Amino acid sequence: TGMQRYLDVSTQIYKTYLKYVSPADIYPYSIDEVFIDVTGYLPYYHMSAHELAMTMVREVLYNTGITATAGIGTNLYLAKLAMDIVAKHIPADKDGVRIAELDEQSYRYLLWNHRPLTDFWMTGPGTVKKLEAHGIYTMGDLARFSIYGEDRLYEIFGVDAEILIDHAWGYEPCGMAEIKSYKPSTNSISEGQVLTCPYPNDKAKLIVREMAEILICLLYTSPSPRDGL
């Protein structure tokens, strides 16, 4: 099936990354997206982060024909935004490859005035609605508000205010070791799709099967314990 092909190619791409870094330094964020901590590998390969990313992306393209996009950041949050927002607005090279980079300073320069706020990782519509009710429409607004209104942010968002403030300034205290060692209170995962119209039974069964295959892949690549599965 098309989904099986998708899973096979995703596995092949993951194996390509493993030629360059240890599994301990890769976190599968989704079936087609990973975080990779290359910090310790740059001296070994005598490459910059951009050069190493380009090397891996080129090999993925050669092996699979898939054009990968990469975001490079000084922390996980900035790497995610570099890929999700910045890379979409830069020209691709001759092979269609886009690689974008962010550090704290370039993040503030490039994205403090970016809208909508929902483009930012972990900033959903509900959070944005509350922020806009207080005149906060950009990450720059949020950063400036946090200087004098930090207590008010904690009143509105509780402990979640801390991560909002950190992200407004381009900080992310959570690193690869923390997300690898995180143990959720439950061991459940889920997959969902929003259908644009009613589906007949045969097509609905195909969608359910594809989602089940995605869950299988996530279980296989997840760093969480699998005892009892």
Tell what function each PLM region has.
Residues 119, 127-222, 226-229:
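DNA-contacting surface of Y-family translesion DNA polymerases
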